[in-house]
Amino acid sequence: YAQEPYFHFCEELYEKCPDGVSLHGFFQSWRYFHNVEDELRKDYTFHEGISEPCKEMMQELDGKEPIMLHVRRGDPNLTDPRGFKWSYTQCGAQHPVQPIDYYEKALSKFDAKQPVIVFSDSVEWVKEQEFFKPDRFMISEPEDKYADGSFTPYADLCLMSLCSHAII
């Protein structure tokens, strides 16, 4: 068992961690993975069945580079492994849900004609917001679903990877 002590790169953990241990933490630094970069890039390359439809969608934008905008609200009915109900709408200061003006301010830095693809775990909420109504916005609604009815993430991830900018 080895625990990452903080959220940035820990050289001591990287250099001295024994093989065969269970790692715990977020490991958000690229420095943990630079020695296996090629293998990771290969493993995380979308196969043609996923990438081709996404590329076709991008071609419909007539060469305009889209902005990826992700709205994270969380499912108000989520239950963690301990049985506690939670969602980002209930997390307050730790994981605040961004108000619409956050997205307005972020988008003001871009050309108003640049298309925006909106991704969300709360698609119905996004559709209800007047802010996302103009033609500039396309709301991603993956067709593939898991048995429980939740959307599969791979098409959204592929589309996000093809966007030129990201607002999260």
Language model region names:
Residues F110-I168:
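Donor-binding and catalytic core of enzymes assembling or modifying cell-surface/extracellular glycoconjugates
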Residues Y1-A112:
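Secretory-pathway luminal glycosyltransferase catalytic domains
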